[in-house]
C-alpha cells in the first residue's frame, strides 16, 4: 500500500460571487523511499497542493478530497490539534525561502529543539544534542556554535540546510520540498539538491519535490507528475516520461529546453503558443485545448485519465510512439 494516497484533491478559493478552482481533482500516490517530482509553470497549483497536504491553506481556501491518507491515517478526519501532531512529526515541509521560514528573534538551537520537544518527550538538553547531530548530518560544521547563532548570521545556503535539518528532526515519513533551491545561487543549488537526494536514499524518505525546472527533475526524480491549470495531466516514471512524453503540454515543455546531446548549437528552442486559461468559474474539457495544435471538438468534453502501464495521461491523443505535437522553431515537421 502507498505511504501517501491522494484521490480527487481539490482546492477552491471564493472570489466574491465566483470561485477560483485552483487545484482540480488530483490523484497520486507516493511510496516509501520514492522521490516524486511535481513539475509545472507558475500558477499551475503546485504550491497550493503542498499547502493542502499540510492543511496550511489560506483561511478562505476550501480543501476537499475523496481520500487523503498517510500510512493509513485519514488526514481529512483529523482535528487541528491532531494535524499539528502530524506536521513536523510524520509529515514535514521544506519551504522555498529560508529567511522567511526561520524566526529572526530565536536562535537556531531554540527553533530546532522546539520541533523535538513539541513531538517527543525529551529534555531540552537532549533536543539540543539531537539538533547538533542533525546540523552535522546536513553538512554544517561547528554545529554547537551554530546552534547559538541567529538566522541573519547565516548565509542563504546554510539557512536552507537548517530548514532541512528542522524537517528531519523527528524522522518524518514524508517530506514536501516546495522549490527549496529557487532563492539560492547555482552552486549552492547543486549542493542542496545532492544533500536532499542523499538523505532521501539514506533514510528511506518519501519526498514530494515541487519545481518548475525540468533539468532538475531529470537528475533527481523517480516519478514525475506534470501539472497544468490545476490538474495533473501526465504522470510516469522519470525515464519513461522523458523518453516517451504523451501529453501535448509535456511535449511542449520538453521542446522548450535544450537537451544535451540532442540540441545542436544555435538551434532555436520551441515555444507553446497562447495563454493559460482562467480557472475562475466552472471548467469543462481539456484545459490545454486552446493551445494544442491537434485539438478537436471532443476535447471540449471532460477528458478522462488514460492509464497505460505505470503511465497516466489526460489526453484523447495519448498513445505510445505518437508523433510529437510540438516542434522546435526552425525545425522541419
Residue spans for each PLM region:
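Conserved ABC transporter NBD signature motif
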Residues: 62-74
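Conserved ABC ATPase "signature" region
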Residues: 73-74, 126-145, 254-255
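Conserved ABC ATPase signature
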Residues: 149-154, 158
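A short, proline-enriched helix->beta-strand linker immediately N-terminal to the Walker B motif
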Residues: 169-173
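P-loop NTP-binding/switch modules centered on Walker-like glycine-rich loops
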Residues: 174-180, 184-267
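Charged, flexible cofactor/metal-binding loops and thiol motifs
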Residues: 237-332
Amino acid at each position: 500500500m502507498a505511504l501517501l494516497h491522494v484521490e480527487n484533491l481539490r482546492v477552491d478559493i471564493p472570489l466574491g460571487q465566483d470561485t477560483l478552482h485552483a487545484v482540480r481533482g488530483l490523484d497520486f500516490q507516493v511510496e516509501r523511499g520514492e522521490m516524486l517530482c511535481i513539475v509545472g509553470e507558475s500558477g499551475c497549483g503546485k504550491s497550493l497542493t503542498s499547502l493542502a497536504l499540510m492543511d496550511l491553506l489560506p483561511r478562505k481556501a476550501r480543501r476537499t478530497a475523496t481520500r487523503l491518507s498517510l500510512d493509513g491515517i485519514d488526514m481529512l478526519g483529523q482535528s487541528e490539534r491532531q494535524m499539528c501532531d502530524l506536521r513536523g512529526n510524520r509529515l514535514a515541509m521544506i519551504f522555498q525561502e529560508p529567511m522567511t521560514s526561520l524566526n529572526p528573534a530565536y536562535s537556531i538551537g531554540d527553533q530546532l529543539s522546539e520541533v523535538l520537544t513539541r513531538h517527543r518527550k525529551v529534555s531540552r538538553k537532549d533536543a539540543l544534542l539531537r539538533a547538533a547531530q542533525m546540523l552535522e548530518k546536513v553538512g554544517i560544521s561547528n554545529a554547537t556554535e551554530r546552534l547559538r547563532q541567529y538566522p541573519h548570521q547565516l548565509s542563504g545556503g546554510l539557512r536552507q540546510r537548517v530548514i532541512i535539518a528542522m524537517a528531519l528532526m523527528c524522522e518524518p515519513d514524508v517530506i514536501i520540498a516546495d522549490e527549496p533551491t529557487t532563492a539560492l545561487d547555482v552552486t549552492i543549488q547543486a549542493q542542496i539538491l545532492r544533500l536532499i537526494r542523499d538523505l532521501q536514499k539514506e533514510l528511506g524518505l518519501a519526498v514530494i519535490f515541487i519545481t518548475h525546472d525540468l533539468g532538475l527533475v531529470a537528475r533527481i526524480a523517480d516519478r514525475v507528475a506534470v501539472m497544468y491549470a490545476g490538474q495533473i495531466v501526465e504522470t510516469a516514471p522519470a525515464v519513461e516520461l522523458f523518453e516517451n512524453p504523451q501529453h501535448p503540454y509535456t511535449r511542449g515543455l520538453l521542446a522548450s529546453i535544450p537537451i544535451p546531446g540532442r540540441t545542436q548549437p544555435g538551434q532555436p528552442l520551441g515555444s507553446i503558443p497562447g495563454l493559460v486559461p482562467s480557472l475562475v468559474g466552472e471548467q469543462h474539457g481539456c484545459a490545454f485545448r486552446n493551445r494544442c495544435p491537434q485539438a478537436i471538438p471532443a476535447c471540449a468534453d471532460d477528458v478522462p485519465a488514460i492509464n497505460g502501464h505505470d503511465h497516466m495521461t489526460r489526453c484523447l491523443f495519448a498513445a505510445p510512439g505518437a508523433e510529437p505535437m510540438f516542434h522546435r522553431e526552425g525545425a522541419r515537421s
